[in-house]
Amino acid sequence: MSHSDQTSPLEARKSAALSGTARVPGDKSISHRALILGALAVGETRISGLLEGQDVIDTGKAMRALGARVERTGEFAWTVRGVGVAGFAQPEAPLDFGNSGTGCRLAMGAVAGSPITATFDGDASLRSRPMRRIVDPLEQMGARVIQSHEGGRLPLTLQGARDPLPITYRTPVPSAQIKSAVLLAGLSAPGVTTVIEAEASRDHTELMLQHFGATLVTEPEGAHGRKISLTGQPELRGARVVVPADPSSAAFPMVAALLVPGSDIVLTEVMTNPLRTGLITTLREMGGAIEESETRDDTGEPMAQFRIRGSRLRGVEVPPERAPSMIDEYLVLAVAAAFAEGTTVMRGLHELRVKESDRLEATADMLRVNGVKVEIVGDDLIVEGKGHVPGGGLVATHMDHRIAMSALVMGLAADRPVKVDDTAFIATSFPDFVPMMRRLGGELA
C-alpha cells in the first residue's frame, strides 16, 4: 500500500495570537480532475498550483499507468500529455489509489468508458469504503465488475465498455463523485448523458469539462437540484489549469484564527466556488470576523483573499441542504461549535459515515475526550458550546487526516493540550499543515 505503518503522534497547546499570511495547498478536487481530464485530452495540459499531497500523487501515478505522460516541471507545476477520450492503455498492474476516494472513483468513471480492464486498490481505509453506488451507473453504461471484495469494495476489477451507452441517471445521494464518474464515462458514449441530482453537489467536474472543450448544459431541477447534460465523444483539448487554494484545507487555519484570541491572519487565493463555501457562511453566522477581498477568476474557478480575526462565536443551526457545500468541513466546524456560546445543531450528516472513517462518530469522540458535551441524534450532530474547551484528551485519528487536523486546531485554544495518536495521514491533503501552523504562531510539538 501507499502509506507506511509508522505513526507520528503530536500535541497542540494553547497558543498566543496567530498572525501572518499563508497560502494553503492547491484544491484537492481540482488537482485530481486536472490530472484525469489532462489524461483524457489530446495535447498538453499545464497545471500550476497542483496539490502535491499523497492522494493527488497517487492519481497522477494511475494516469501514467493508463498511458498518459505525467511530469513534474517545477514546484506545484505539472504537465500531462493525454491519450484522448477512450484512449487509455491496459495497465500492467493494479492501480493503487492509497487513501484517495476521489481519485479512485473518478478514475473508475474514466476507465468505464475505455475498452480496457483495470484493477482498483487502495489502503485499508479506502478498502473499507463503499464503491457499489459508483459502479451501479457505470454498469448501466456497459462497464462490468469482474471481481470485487465483499459488498463491492476494493480491490475491484472493472472492465470498461467497448461501446458505452449514454444514460439518464438520478443520483441516490448528493455526491460529486457519483456525478463525476458518470460524466467521465459519458465522454466516451455517443449522444447525451444526463445526471439529475436532487441537491446540487460540487460542480468542479462540469466547469473543468467545459474548460477542456466539452459541450455541457446545466439546468435547475426542483428546489435545490440540478440536471447536467453532457454531449458525448468530444475531442478534449489540453488546457492551462490554475489550481486555487483548497477551501477545505483553508478551514483549519481559518477556524484556528477565530478561536485563538487576538489572532489576525490572511489566507490568499482561496477558492470561493459557491458550492464550497458553506463553512465560511456558517462561521460568519456564528459571529466570525472573516473579510473577503481581491476576488478573481482563473480557469473557471473563483478565488479570493480572506482576513480572519479572533472572534467570540455563538451556537447556530446548520440546515441539511448546506451539507454538500461543506461535507469535509463539519469536523473543524464541530471544533468551532465547541468553543462557541450556546448549542450548535448540524443536520443531515449521513455522508460523514462513509468517509475515510465514520466521521460522525469520530467527531463526537474527539470532542468527548476533550470535555465537550456532544450528542448524535440520527444523522444530526449536536454540540453544546461553553465558550471554552477543557482539552487534555488523546484523539484517535482512525487514519483520517481531517480528524487529526481538527483535533490539533482544538488544542491551540483549549485549556489543556490536545494530543493526536497519528499525524502521518495529514500528508494526503495538507503536507505543509504543521509547519504552516507553526509559522502562524501555533504551539505544535
From Swiss-Prot:
Put simply, this protein is called 3-phosphoshikimate 1-carboxyvinyltransferase
Originating organism? Rhodopseudomonas palustris (strain BisB5)
| Binding, 3-phosphoshikimate | K28, S29, R33, S175, Q177, D328, K355
| Reported function | Catalyzes the transfer of the enolpyruvyl moiety of phosphoenolpyruvate (PEP) to the 5-hydroxyl of shikimate-3-phosphate (S3P) to produce enolpyruvyl shikimate-3-phosphate and inorganic phosphate.
Task: Tell me where it mainly resides.
Answer: cytoplasm
Q: Where is the active site?
A: D328 (proton acceptor)
Class of this enzyme: transferase
- GO BP, one example? aromatic amino acid family biosynthetic process
